[in-house]
Swiss-Prot record:
Cysteines joined through disulfide linkages: 36-173, 48-186, 172-177
Species of the source: Rattus norvegicus
PROSITE patterns: INSULIN
Protein known as: Prorelaxin 1
UniProt entry tagged with the keyword Signal: yes
Cellular component GO terms, alphabetical: extracellular region
Cited PANTHER family: PRORELAXIN H2 (PTHR12004:SF13), RELAXIN (PTHR12004)
GO molecular function: hormone activity; signaling receptor binding
């Protein structure tokens, strides 16, 4: 019985003495690997899946400009400095200045507004107004993309990310690449 306990303790001690794979050395990240096809996919999952890529990027460079630009467009209920009905007022262009002031001050809306509120929420006009406002705040999107992605401004960004991923996979296959360069795509 005591030999069985000692064997289990020895196994437990060996298990604990193994180095943690979550800690990654700089040499491992900077090692040049040459992988193709499924091997590239496995390497990408290995680097990005364990959040190693995020740690490597946090040490290397600040956030890209595209992420900083999208951080400016925050709904008013999240952004504490914004006025509460900022987006609502922009989407209702036919509202008089007096009623807009009442909404922005937080006073009870006029009864006429309460009876038209369901119609405004379902109307295509208010949706188009919201899309135009959202589009203007994000900046110009490429005209070649589909209209759904045109207003979101993500078509050009996602296309660039896909193209850079394809170029990197070809480079990793033919020439070789570092795990750190794969981590930039995470």
């Amino acid at each position: 019985m005591s030999s069985r306990l000692l064997l289990q303790l020895l196994g437990f001690w060996l298990f604990l003495s193994q180095p943690c794979r979550a800690r990654v050395s700089e040499e491992w990240m900077d090692q040049v690997i040459q992988v193709c096809g499924r091997g590239y996919a496995r390497a990408w999952i290995e680097v990005c899946g364990a959040s190693v890529g995020r740690l490597a990027l946090s040490q290397e460079e600040p956030a890209p400009l595209a992420r900083q630009a999208t951080a400016e467009v925050v709904p008013s209920f999240i952004n504490k400095d914004a006025e509460p009905f900022d987006m609502t007022l922009k989407c209702l262009p036919n509202l008089s200045e007096e009623r807009k002031a009442a909404l922005s001050e937080g006073r009870a809306p006029f009864p006429e507004l309460q009876q038209h509120a369901p119609a405004l929420s379902d109307s295509v006009v208010s949706l188009e107004g919201f899309k135009k406002t959202f589009h203007n705040q994000l900046g110009e999107a490429e005209d070649g993309g589909p209209p759904e992605l045109k207003y979101l401004g993500s078509d050009a960004q996602s296309r660039k990310k896909r193209q850079s991923g394809a170029l990197l996979s070809e480079q990793c296959c033919h020439i070789g690449c570092t795990r750190r360069s794969i981590a930039k795509l995470c």
